[in-house]
A protein has these predicted regions:
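Acidic, metal/ion-coordinating pockets
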Residues: 1-181
């Protein structure tokens, strides 16, 4: 939080990120710092499960999803933030965090109506929530998750699940921690 996201934005731009989701730590210093970070990055910042219309710094500037093209294929990316972010960080009183399953399904429906049939959720809501989202939605192909620092592996006995964990037709992977995945 010392650099208020400036160094992270520079590095992420150099790495060529396609998009990212908002996690609770993006709100550690309030919406002002998140907006500064968003202005500094060259890619969309996503959050599907929050109403930011009452926060003028974010209203109209924070997308719920985006579409990228790779190899001639359209990929829909959806952002998912912890529903309890208002308890974990400092988003201020003007942002309302909502239930993740309905938020994700709403974006899946919009993307599929646009002809997108490959949907990836970028989640910072934790492994348990990611499993619930996979079980409660249709049309999500992959969830790339973080927040809970959950180790998934097919060889490590300490792992909390298989890599990938498959729920219905959705593959779930987790970022784990310290650059490991």
């Amino acid at each position: 939080t010392y650099y208020k996201g400036k160094l992270a934005a520079e590095m992420m731009n150099k790495l060529g990120y396609d998009a990212m989701t908002v996690g609770n730590h993006e709100f550690d210093d309030g919406p002002e710092v998140l907006r500064g970070f968003m202005d500094a990055v060259d890619f969309p910042v996503l959050m599907s499960n929050a109403d930011v219309s009452g926060e003028e710094l974010l209203a109209g500037n924070l997308a719920k999803s985006t579409v990228i093209e790779r190899g001639g294929q359209k990929l829909g990316l959806i952002g998912l933030t912890p529903q309890d972010t208002d308890e974990l960080a400092s988003p201020g009183p003007n942002i309302i965090f909502t239930e993740p399953v309905n938020a994700v399904q709403g974006e899946v429906d919009k993307l599929t109506d646009m002809g997108v049939n490959k949907i990836i959720v970028l989640s910072h809501s934790g492994y348990v929530v990611d499993q619930a989202v996979a079980a409660g939605t249709t049309g999500v192909d992959v969830i790339v998750g973080g927040h809970s620092n959950t180790l998934l592996s097919n060889t490590n006995e300490r792992a909390e699940g298989a890599y990938p964990t498959v729920v219905g037709a959705t593959a779930i992977v987790q970022a784990y921690a310290y650059g490991k995945f």
